[in-house]
């Protein structure tokens, strides 16, 4: 019996973590990839992601080592007071290209990205993902496409350590702990989505 393998784009946020656990529970061999592009929040985000990987590895033997890849970022996204319309040009194509290249080198035929497709960005919709799929020689899986964040949490968070996830563009480190700012758009989206678990 052949074993399914997948490269999962894993940033340690809600969607990518729920997706990681989804494939682990389905007994896929999961190869997590974190892509660095030089953004201000990445050092703490990656530190938190590595801790989450270690926590998860103790529970799932089918979780492979976390691979950190680096891509060029010609223009840094500056810290902003108002980040509601924060858009990182070509972000998804860069992520998919990096993960796709890694998958091909490993002989893996599938990569997975946790895009929801609900944001009004040109590279964040089902049609774009289909066109992107046609450019690479691996299958691009988008299991949460068309879903809201709270729907992902409600449907796929069982057994997922949501308290260990991080979705923030201004995280801080205090007393050895990484703390989200609580006010950026990513934090607000996360807080709003988590409220649905209490309804």
Describe every region a protein language model picked out:
Residues 2-199:
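Nucleotide-activated chemistry modules centered on ATP-dependent adenylation/adenylyltransferase
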């Amino acid at each position: 019996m052949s074993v399914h393998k997948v490269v999962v784009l894993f940033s340690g946020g809600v969607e990518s973590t729920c997706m990681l656990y989804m494939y682990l529970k389905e007994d896929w061999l999961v190869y997590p990839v974190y892509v660095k592009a030089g953004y201000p929040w990445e050092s703490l985000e990656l530190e938190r992601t590595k801790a989450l990987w270690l926590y998860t590895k103790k529970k799932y033997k089918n979780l492979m080592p976390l691979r950190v890849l680096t891509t060029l970022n010609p223009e840094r996204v500056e810290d902003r007071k108002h980040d509601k319309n924060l858009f990182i040009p070509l972000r998804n194509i860069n992520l998919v290209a990096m993960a796709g290249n890694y998958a091909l080198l490993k002989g893996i035929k599938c990569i997975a990205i946790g895009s929801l497709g609900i944001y009004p960005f040109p590279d964040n919709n089902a049609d774009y993902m289909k066109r992107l799929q046609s450019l690479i020689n691996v299958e691009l899986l988008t299991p949460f496409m068309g879903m809201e964040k709270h729907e992902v949490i409600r449907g796929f968070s069982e057994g997922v350590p949501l308290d260990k996830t991080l979705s923030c563009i201004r995280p801080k480190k205090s007393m050895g702990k990484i703390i989200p700012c609580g006010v950026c758009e990513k934090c607000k989206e996360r807080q709003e989505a988590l409220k649905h678990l209490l309804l």
